[in-house]
Amino acid sequence: QALCQFQPYCLDGHCATYQIERFTTVLADRKASTADRALALRLLIHMLGDIHQPLHTSDNNDRGGNSVKVRLYTGKRQYSLHEVMDTVLIKQLIGSQRLDTYANQLKTTYQPQFSRWLVGSPKEWAAQSHVLATQQVYRQLPEFTCGIAPKTTLTLSESYVYVAKTYLPEQMAKAGVRMAYILNSTLK
């Protein structure tokens, strides 16, 4: 039921949102060792990215989509749903472009929304990603049942892939803008 009824959990601080706060504090501490601050920076960047990938903020008794086997409508290769959202569609979006070119495209497209995206906290941002997972990533799957991972390989329709390719770039842009904001305010 975690997917259908979002219940934020953070058992003993073992969650990304708590760790983001922790790593931000270490990074801001000028008395912390260089090694500790460098590790905090690496992990902060990783965790901030993770909370913007919807399947990192949700679970349908399927290990965040890792147990859901899917195929794209264009092929026969089998992937996990998590892999499709984390890697396959992102690579398709970027294509043969250089990463900095794609990043500049995201900036140009989404810049008018940047200030609005800075409202809230990592907990709220993770909750927003969870809603996206609930309403789009999972609920739009063929044969979706809340709380039950599919037993068969699902084919992701052209429509499903098209819609995913509309929200994934925005999630990447949000992650980048929020990361820049946190780093700039922490390291000023």
Segments predicted by a language model, with ranges:
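N-terminal, motif-rich segments that launch catalysis or mediate targeting to/interaction with membranes
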Residues: 1-47, 54-188
